C-alpha cells in the first residue's frame, strides 16, 4: 500500500513537471542548497515571531489576571478615552443663551487660571533651578579656594623659576591692583603706621577701620566694624600668652556681656526704625523711653491679641510681652517698671527679678535660682504664653534645649537668648538641661549647625556675626577670608585683633589657615595670621609695593621657623617681586651716598635688609640687581664678585650700542671710578680679577675696532700670555692663580693674540720690496720674532692645565703654520 502511494505521488510529480515545462512563458526557477536553507530560515523566523508575540500576550494575561485585571477590558477602556474634551475650543453660543455664556466664562476663567499657574510654575522652577546651580557653583568655588588656602605653605606659590639671564626684565609700571575698598583700608594702615613709627600715642586701629567703613556706604560693613569695636572693648587680662587670657573665665564673661550689649542695642535701633516707619500704627506717645517705645512696637508686632497669653495686661498690652521686649532692648529698669505695675499678677517673680537686675553679672543666687527653676518645671514649662517661658528661662538659665522659636524667630534673637543663658560657674547640682557653657554653645554653632545651616553664600555677614559674637574670632575671620568679596574686611579685622593681642595665632607657618593644636582646650582654634597677610598682599605686591610694605610692618616682631624676621623676609620677596629697588631700598648717588627709600621709615638697620634682598636676588640668578644692592649696602667684596661673573661671559663680545656688554661695561667702569676715588677696595684676588677683566674689555674693544698695534700693546702689558719662549713657564705658573672668570676667556684671548700676530705677519709680507730704509735683515728678524711669539703661544696652550673650548688648538696651529 505504501508502494502504491509513492508510485502515485511520483506519477503526479512527473505530470506536473511536464505541464510546467510545456508553458514557455514562465522561466525556470532554480535554487541551490544554500538559497533553500536561507528561505527556510526566513519562514522559520516569521513563525517564531508570531509564536513569541502570542507567548508574551499569554504571559501578560497571566500576570495581570493574577491581580484581577482583564487585558481586553483595559484595552477597550483605553481606546474609549480621549483628551479632546479637556482643552477643546468652547462652542459658540447665542447672545441670548445666558447659561451657555456663563458656562463659557467659567471655563475660560478656569483655563486662564490653569495656564497662568502653569506658566508661573515653570518660571519658578527655572528660577529655583538657576539659584540652585549658582549656590552649588559658589559652594564648589569656596571648597576649592578653601582647599588651596588650607594646604601647605607653597599651595598658592605661582612664582616662576628664575630665567638663565643675568638681569631681570621688569615691565612698565601698571595700574593699581587695589579696588576702592582695599585702597580705603590701605590709607588707614598708612596713618596707623605713621603714628607707630614716629613714637606718638598709638591710635586705635579699630576706630580707623570703622572710619573707612563708614565712608564705604555699606551697612553690612559698617555694622561689622561696630560689632568688632563692641567685642574688643574688653579689659585685657594679664597672662603669659593670649591663649590663657582668652580662655580665662573673666575674659569670656566680658565677651558674652559685650555681645549681649551689642545685640540689645541693635534690637533697640531696629525697634526705633520700625516704630518711626509705622507711626500711624505704632501710636507713639508718652514719656520718651524704652517702655513707651516697646508699647508702640507691640502695636506693630502684636496688632491683634494672641491667644494663650497669661497674667493679664497693662494698659492693654500683655505683661510678659512687655517684660520680654524691654529686656530684649537691654533696659532692665523698664522691665522692672512693668514688673512693679503687675506685681500682684506675677507672685514671687518680682523678688527674683529684682535680685537678677541688681547683680552685675545678671545672675541669681543658687537658692533663688533653684527655687525659680523648680517653679518653672512645675508651672511655667507647660504654659501657653511663649513670652513668659522665655523670660523664666533667661532669668533662671534653665531648659537650655528650648529654642523659643515663637519669640526668637531671628538668628539675632536666638543668639541673645542663648547667650543670656550661658553660665560660667561649675554647678554640680545643675542638670544638663539647665546648663549651657560658652564652649558648648560655640561647638553647637560652628560644628553642629555649621555653614550649611546659615546659608552663608547668601548671608555671609550673618554667619560672621554668629561666630564673632560667640568669641570665635579666628573661625569668623577664616570664613570671611574665603569669600573674595569680603576678604579685605577679614584681613583688617585680623589686624585689629592682632594689635589688641586678642588673636590666637598658629605656632607654625605651615599650618592651615584655621587649625587646632593638640593639647589645647576643645573648640580653641588658631589662625595662621602670617599666611593670611601674605595671601592678601600677594594680589597687589607687583603694582602697589608701598602699600604692601605697610602691611608687612605688622610682622616686624614675628619670626619664621628659622628664627628670621618675617618683616625682613617679606620685604625681600616684595622687592624681588616688584623690582622697585630704588623706590623701596633707596638709590646710590654718583658721589657714593645713598638716597633713602621707603624702607628707611620703618627701620634704621637698612643695611641688613638690603643685604638680605641682595642675597635673595643672587640666589635667583639676578646678578646685576644683586650687585647694585650689595653696592647700596657697602659690600664691595660681593659687588666685585658678582660684577666679575657678569663681565666674564661678555668680555670677548663685539660691543654695540645699548647691548648687554655695553651696559655692563659702563656699570663696571662707574664702580671702578667710584671705588678708586673713594679708596674702596675688595679682597685682593677679587679686586685683581675685576681690573684685569676691565683691561681685557679694553683689549677686545681695540681688537674688534681693528687697532692691531694698540691691542697688541695692551695684551703685552697685561703679561697674561707669553710672547717669548723664555716667558712660557712663567706664564703657565701664573695661570694657576687666575680665577675662573679669566680662564673662561683664555681661548678667545689666545685666538685674538694669534690673529694679531698673523695680521702683523701678513702686513709685513705685503709691505713690498726691501728698501734702503728697511734692510732685508731687519725684515727677516721681524718675521723670526713673530714666528717665535706664535710658537710661544702654541707651547703655552699645550702646557696649561686647562681644557680649552672647541677647536682652539687646531686654529692656533693652523695660523702658526701659515706664518711658517
UniProtKB/Swiss-Prot annotation:
InterPro entries: Nucleoporin_int_Nup93/Nic96. It comes from the Eukaryota. GO terms for cellular component: cytosol; nuclear membrane; nuclear periphery; nuclear pore. Coiled coil: none annotated. Keywords: Membrane, mRNA transport, Nuclear pore complex, Nucleus, Protein transport, Translocation, Transport. It is a peripheral membrane protein. The keyword Nucleotide-binding does not apply. Disulfide bonds: none annotated. One of its GO terms (molecular function) is structural constituent of nuclear pore. It is found in: Nucleus membrane; Nucleus, Nuclear pore complex. Pfam families: Nic96 (PF04097). Its main location: nucleus. One of its GO terms (biological process) is nuclear pore complex assembly. Plays a role in the nuclear pore complex (NPC) assembly and/or maintenance. Belongs to the nucleoporin interacting component (NIC) family. This is Nuclear pore complex protein Nup93. It comes from Xenopus laevis (African clawed frog). The lineage of its organism: Eukaryota, Metazoa, Chordata, Craniata, Vertebrata.
Amino acid at each position: 500500500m505504501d508502494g502504491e502511494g509513492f508510485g502515485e505521488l511520483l506519477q503526479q510529480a512527473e505530470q506536473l513537471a511536464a505541464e510546467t515545462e510545456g508553458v514557455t512563458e514562465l522561466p525556470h526557477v532554480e535554487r541551490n542548497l544554500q538559497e533553500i536553507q536561507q528561505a527556510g530560515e526566513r519562514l522559520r523566523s516569521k513563525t517564531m515571531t508570531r509564536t513569541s508575540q502570542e507567548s508574551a500576550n499569554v504571559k501578560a494575561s497571566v500576570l495581570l489576571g493574577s491581580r484581577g485585571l482583564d487585558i481586553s477590558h483595559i484595552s477597550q477602556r483605553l481606546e474609549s478615552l480621549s483628551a479632546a474634551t479637556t482643552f477643546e475650543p468652547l462652542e459658540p453660543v447665542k447672545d441670548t443663551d445666558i447659561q451657555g455664556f456663563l458656562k463659557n466664562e467659567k471655563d475660560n476663567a478656569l483655563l486662564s487660571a490653569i495656564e497662568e499657574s502653569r506658566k508661573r510654575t515653570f518660571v519658578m522652577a527655572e528660577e529655583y533651578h538657576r539659584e540652585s546651580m549658582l549656590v552649588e557653583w559658589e559652594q564648589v568655588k569656596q571648597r576649592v579656594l578653601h582647599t588651596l588656602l588650607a594646604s601647605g605653605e607653597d599651595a598658592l606659590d605661582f612664582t616662576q623659576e628664575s630665567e638663565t639671564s643675568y638681569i631681570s626684565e621688569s615691565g612698565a609700571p601698571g595700574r593699581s591692583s587695589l579696588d576702592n575698598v582695599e585702597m580705603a583700608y590701605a590709607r588707614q594702615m598708612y596713618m596707623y603706621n605713621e603714628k607707630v613709627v614716629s613714637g606718638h600715642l598709638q591710635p586705635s586701629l579699630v576706630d580707623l577701620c570703622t572710619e573707612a567703613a563708614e565712608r564705604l556706604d555699606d551697612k553690612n560693613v559698617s555694622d561689622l566694624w561696630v560689632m568688632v569695636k563692641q567685642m574688643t572693648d574688653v579689659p585685657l587680662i594679664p597672662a603669659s600668652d593670649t591663649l590663657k587670657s582668652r580662655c580665662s573665665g573673666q575674659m569670656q564673661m566680658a565677651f558674652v556681656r559685650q555681645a549681649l550689649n551689642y545685640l540689645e542695642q541693635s534690637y533697640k535701633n531696629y525697634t526705633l526704625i520700625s516704630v518711626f516707619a509705622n507711626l500711624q500704627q505704632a501710636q507713639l506717645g508718652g514719656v520718651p523711653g524704652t517702655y513707651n517705645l516697646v508699647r508702640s512696637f507691640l502695636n506693630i508686632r502684636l496688632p491683634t491679641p494672641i491667644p494663650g497669653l497669661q497674667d493679664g495686661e497693662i494698659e492693654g498690652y500683655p505683661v510678659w510681652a512687655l517684660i520680654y521686649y524691654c529686656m530684649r532692648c537691654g533696659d532692665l529698669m523698664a522691665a522692672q517698671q512693668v514688673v512693679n505695675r503687675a506685681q500682684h499678677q506675677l507672685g514671687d517673680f518680682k523678688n527674683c527679678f529684682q535680685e537678677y537686675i541688681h547683680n552685675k553679672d545678671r545672675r541669681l543666687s543658687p537658692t533663688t535660682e533653684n527655687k525659680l527653676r523648680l517653679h518653672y518645671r512645675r508651672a511655667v514649662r507647660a504654659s501657653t504664653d511663649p513670652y513668659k517661658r522665655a523670660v523664666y528661662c533667661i532669668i533662671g538659665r534653665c531648659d537650655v534645649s528650648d529654642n523659643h522659636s515663637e519669640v526668637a524667630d531671628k538668628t539675632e534673637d536666638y543668639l541673645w537668648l542663648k547667650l543670656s543663658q550661658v553660665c560660667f560657674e561649675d554647678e554640680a547640682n545643675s542638670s544638663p538641661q539647665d546648663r549651657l557653657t560658652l564652649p558648648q554653645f560655640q561647638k553647637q554653632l560652628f560644628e553642629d549647625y555649621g555653614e550649611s545651616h546659615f546659608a552663608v553664600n547668601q548671608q555671609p555677614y550673618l554667619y560672621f556675626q554668629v561666630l564673632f559674637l560667640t568669641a570665635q574670632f579666628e573661625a569668623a575671620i577664616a570664613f570671611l577670608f574665603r569669600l573674595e568679596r569680603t576678604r579685605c574686611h577679614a584681613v583688617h579685622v585680623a589686624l585689629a585683633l592682632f594689635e589688641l593681642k586678642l588673636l590666637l595665632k598658629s605656632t607654625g607657618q605651615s599650618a592651615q589657615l584655621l587649625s587646632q593644636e593638640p593639647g589645647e582646650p576643645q573648640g580653641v582654634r588658631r589662625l595662621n595670621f602670617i599666611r593670611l597677610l601674605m595671601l592678601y598682599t600677594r594680589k597687589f605686591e607687583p603694582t602697589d609695593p608701598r602699600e604692601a610694605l605697610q602691611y608687612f610692618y605688622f610682622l616686624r616682631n614675628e619670626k619664621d621657623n628659622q628664627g628670621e624676621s618675617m618683616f625682613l623676609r617679606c620685604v625681600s620677596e616684595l622687592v624681588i617681586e616688584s623690582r622697585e629697588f630704588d623706590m623701596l631700598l633707596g638709590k646710590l648717588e654718583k658721589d657714593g651716598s645713598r638716597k633713602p627709600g621707603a624702607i628707611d621709615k620703618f627701620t634704621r638697620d637698612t643695611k641688613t635688609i638690603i643685604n638680605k634682598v641682595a642675597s635673595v636676588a643672587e640666589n635667583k640668578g639676578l646678578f646685576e640687581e644683586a650687585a647694585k644692592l650689595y653696592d647700596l649696602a657697602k659690600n664691595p667684596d660681593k659687588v666685585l664678585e658678582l660684577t666679575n661673573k657678569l663681565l666674564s661671559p661678555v668680555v670677548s663680545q663685539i660691543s654695540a650700542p645699548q647691548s648687554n656688554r655695553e651696559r655692563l661695561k659702563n656699570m663696571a667702569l662707574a664702580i671702578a671710578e667710584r671705588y678708586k676715588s673713594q679708596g674702596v677696595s675688595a679682597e685682593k684676588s677679587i679686586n685683581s680679577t675685576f681690573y684685569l677683566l676691565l683691561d681685557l674689555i679694553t683689549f677686545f674693544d681695540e681688537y674688534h675696532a681693528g687697532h692691531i698695534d694698540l691691542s697688541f700693546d695692551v695684551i703685552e702689558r697685561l703679561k697674561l700670555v707669553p710672547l717669548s719662549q723664555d716667558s712660557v713657564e712663567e706664564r703657565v705658573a701664573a695661570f694657576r692663580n687666575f680665577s675662573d672668570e679669566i680662564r673662561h676667556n683664555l681661548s678667545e684671548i689666545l685666538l685674538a693674540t694669534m690673529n694679531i700676530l698673523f695680521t702683523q705677519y701678513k702686513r709685513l709680507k705685503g709691505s713690498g720690496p726691501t728698501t734702503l730704509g728697511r734692510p732685508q735683515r731687519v725684515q727677516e728678524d721681524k718675521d723670526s720674532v713673530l714666528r717665535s711669539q706664535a710658537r710661544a703661544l702654541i707651547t703655552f696652550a699645550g702646557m696649561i692645565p686647562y681644557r680649552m673650548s672647541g677647536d682652539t688648538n687646531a686654529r692656533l696651529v693652523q695660523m702658526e703654520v701659515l706664518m711658517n
